[in-house]
Amino acid sequence: MDIKRFIANFADLFEETDPATISAATKFKELEEWSSLVALSVIAMVDEEYDVEFRGDDIRGSSTVEDLYNIVNNRVMAYS
């Protein structure tokens, strides 16, 4: 699993935020567009793209895009 691809998939969920402004260190909850609807979209994206379970608690316990990636990557590796 590649963090650059994860960041691109994450950035695609935002309509008005420039994808170039999103990096591994981005504190996603501070993005102007961040909302509960985007959080649900993240959960759906992870399920569709990576075929692993991802919950609201995972998002609540994360601060950066890299935190999200690490959770997803660990689950992908565990299921491999």
Which residues are covered by each model-predicted region?
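Phosphopantetheine-dependent thiolation modules in NRPS/PKS and related acyl-activating systems
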Residues: 1-43, 48-80
